[in-house]
A protein has these predicted regions:
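Conserved alpha-helical substructure of the radical SAM core
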Residues: 3-6, 10-134, 145-156, 160, ...
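PLP-dependent aminotransferase class I/II
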Residues: 174, 190-195, 225
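A glycine-centered beta->alpha junction motif in the catalytic cores
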Residues: 139-143
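Conserved strand-turn element in the central/C-terminal portion of the radical SAM core barrel
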Residues: 162-185, 205-207
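Aromatic-anchored helix/helix-loop segment that forms the rim or "lid"
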Residues: 221-229
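Flexible glycine/acidic-rich beta-alpha junction loops that bind and position SAM and/or redox cofactors
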Residues: 181, 201-222
Length: 229
């Protein structure tokens, strides 16, 4: 079973005393019995994706998961996912260290990235740190268009890094969320995956605001979120 650790809950446990901390501790009493964990390892992201949870959280507390804290997780879990709910794992300065430790322990890992504001050399260092890892690259549309949702992203740089990653890791996966601006480019993206030996993860979203200009035209390309009373 996989447990996702959200940064906000994590900070509540660390920051507050008394009843608040106690109640959260009780909620995660079975935390260490899980087989896998999804970690938000920092509070950092350089992108400004409109439908991201970051846009609705007024105060995101600054935090970096320390190496000592990570070592605690490493003792208890066999599978790690670095898929930030409000952060991008590539922006943690010790991501390569975490990956190296997971690999040395013979454990599995996947990494989800979309930010492009680190030097190429750091990405390569992280790729090399865990040769059996799987990486998901968030490029929503053709590389030249991905910034239309992934605001401030250099999609062409990330595509190039995705191709480079094939030399070092187990799987390089193109994660493609369907939007109005890219719904007609899916077949082209699939052809690029075949050409370059990539896997594709095609995602239909349900995070749509009323009259959302990013919402695909075709009803086959999105989900409708159920409304509950």
């Amino acid at each position: 079973m996989l447990l996702c650790v959200r940064l906000r809950s994590y900070h509540l446990r660390r920051k507050h005393n008394g009843n608040c901390a106690q109640s959260i501790t009780l909620e995660i009493s079975e935390f260490w019995t899980r087989g896998g964990v999804n970690l938000d390892i920092s509070s950092r992201c350089t992108l400004a994706c409109p439908n991201c949870a970051r846009q609705s959280i007024a105060d995101i507390p600054a935090n970096l998961l320390s190496e000592a804290e990570f070592d605690t997780y490493l003792k208890h879990f066999d599978r790690f996912i670095f898929c930030g709910q409000i952060s991008d794992p590539i922006l943690h300065p010790k991501l390569d260290v975490f990956l190296s430790k997971i690999y040395a322990a013979g454990k599995m890992c996947s990494v989800h990235v979309a930010a492009t504001h680190k030097p190429d050399a750091f990405y390569t260092k992280c790729f090399k740190a865990h040769p059996k890892s799987n990486w998901y690259f968030g490029i929503d549309g053709l590389p030249k268009d991905s910034h239309k949702y992934r605001v401030r992203q250099d999609g062409e740089k990330l595509f190039r890094l995705m191709l480079e990653s094939r030399k070092y890791i187990a799987k390089s996966i193109w994660q493609y969320i369907i939007f109005k601006y890219n719904e007609n480019d899916v077949d082209t993206a699939k052809a690029l995956c075949i050409e370059h030996g990539l896997e594709m993860s095609l995602i239909k979203s349900n995070r749509w605001a009323k009259d959302d200009p990013l919402k695909p035209t075709s009803t086959d390309n999105y989900y409708i979120r159920e409304q509950h009373e």
